[in-house]
Each structure stands twice: as C-alpha cells, then as structure tokens.
Amino acid sequence: AVLKKGDILILSGSLPGSVPTDIYKTLMEEVQGKEIPVIVDAIGDALLKTLPLHPFLIKPNHQELSELFCVELTTREQVVPYAKKLQEQGARNVLVSLGGAGAVLLDQNGMVHESDVPRGKLINAVGAGDSMVAGFLTGYLEKQGMEHAFCMGVAAGSASAFSEGLADRETVEQLYRQIRKA
C-alpha cells in the first residue's frame, strides 16, 4: 500500500541491531512532498536523523531527552529548553512525557503546554508512551487543536498506566475532563 495525502505515518520503537539507524529517515524521505504528517517515537540516532525532515511530532520521554543531551532532566521546567533544541533541529511539535511529573508539549506555534498527571493508581506503565501518541493523534484529528490533542495524549497515556491492559475510551474521557479542569 502506498501512503497518500490524508494518511499519517507513525515511526515508533527501538530498532534491532541489524537495521540501520537511519531507517526512519529513509522512510520519511519516501513520503516527502506528499503532505503526510510523520510522528516519530524513537531514541538516539534513529530520532535525531529524522529531525532535518521536520517530523510533525516527536515524543521522547524525559529519560530519552536526558540521554540525547547528556544531562539529567526531571522537571517540566528543565525539559522545555531541551525540547526547544529539538525544534531548532527540525521537529515541529515536541511532546515529552515525564512519568509522574506530567508532560510538556512545545507546539509549532511556540506555545508551551504543561500538564500534571491526573489522579489514579499506577498499575502498568508499559505502553503508556504509545498510548500518549495515540491519544494525541486522536485529539488532533478530532479538533486540529494542540491543547485538545495534548490533553487527550496525557489522558490516554495515563489511562493506559492506570490499567492492566488497554484503557477504554470512557476512562480516557474521564481523565481528559480531570486534566481540562486543572
């Protein structure tokens, strides 16, 4: 299947050693000029090599961001200048998850969006980052607004972390309302 305008390409996950670290960059080059937004959720060189191609969204967590810049980042305030550096290198929107410390989005319009984590009990953080990306994308496609997309991302990631398995839409929406009131 060939990607076309209206499609979205998500490049996510760590790469096995047998795959070149520029594979995500190569895949992005294939869709250049086709008006296909690309989301990159990767680490290290696999992420950095995509930045000159201006991915629509990248989603490092605070530990991955710390490793990229060889610093320790634990707060939203510390994360912001380093997320801006990734924008300066080409990323349009940078979404950084900080686990229990919340999340930050630097959007393509220069706005900084911040959120605490909604109330809930951590059960399983595995997949919470993927759920955050899915929630962000869902929110963006619903309203094209960055604040709504950001809050949906935080809600979906949190709902996943508060669940044994996949979170349901009702839980995501409940957490979304909690985030919007904050």
Features from the language model and the residues they span:
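Conserved phosphate-binding/catalytic loop of the ribokinase/pfkB sugar-kinase fold
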Residues: 1-4
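Structural motif
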Residues: 7-8, 93
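Conserved beta-alpha-beta core of the PfkB/ribokinase-like small-molecule kinase fold
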Residues: 8-78
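Conserved phosphate-binding/catalytic region of the ribokinase-like
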Residues: 29-30, 48, 76-182
